[in-house]
Amino acid sequence: MDEILAIHNLTKKFDDLVVLDGINMSIKKGEVVVIVGPSGCGKSTFLRCLNGLENIQDGEVLLDGDVINPSKVKNNKSREKLGMVFQSYDLFPHKTILQNVTLAPVKVKKRKKDEVTQEALALLERVGLSAKKDNYPRQLSGGQKQRVAIVRALIMHPEVLLLDEITAALDPEMVREVLDVVLSLAREGRTMVIVTHEMQFARAVADRMIFLDGGKIVEEGTPQEFFDNPKTDRLKKFLQTFTYES
C-alpha cells in the first residue's frame, strides 16, 4: 500500500500545556488506524489537527505529499480530501436529512444538485435511512443521526475519513448500528483514522492500533499484538480497565 497521510513531529500546545508532543505517523491507502488512550491524552485534538481545525505549533501534515497545515497553507484543496465525523453529529437542525447531506457537495464542490441527490439517496439507502430523507434531525435517534453524519462525510468523496468517538454519545443499543456501518467501510478498503473507546470494535476493524498517552505514541501494533501481547506496562494497565473480574 502507498502512503497517503504523513505526520511529522506534530506538536500542539494550549498556552503552556503540551497536548501533542512530536507525533510521527505514516498511514497507507486503505489502512484503518485506530487510536485509543485515556481521556485527555490528545486523541481528539490529534484528529482536529489533521483536519485543520486546530493550528499546530510545530511539525507538518502531508496528504498525498501536499502540506495541509492550516498555519502554512490557506484554502488548500487537499484539505477537502479529509472527511470528519464528530461525536456530536453537527447536523443542521432546520434542514431535512436529505438537505443536510446534499448541502456541502452542491455549495462547496459546485456539483449538480440532481446528481448529488441521487448519490445521497443511494448512500442513505445503504445505511438504512432512505425512508427518513424528509425528516429533521430532531425526529431521529442518536444512532440514526450519526449514520447521517457518516453519509454526509462520504458524499464529499474523502480520501481519508476521520472518526472521532462517534459512539460516545449513543445509548448502548444504538452503538452497534453505527459500528456496523464503519466496519463495512473498512472492508471496502477505505482509509480511516478512528478514535474510540469501543475495544471489541477496535480489534475487529483495525489494521493497526495506536496507544496515545500524555501526547505521545506509547505503543502501536497489529490488533493481535496490541491486545494479546502488550509490551509496555502503561498499555497493560490501560487495557485492564476494560476487563472486570470479581
Each model region followed by its residue ranges:
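ABC family nucleotide-binding domain
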Residues: D2-P223
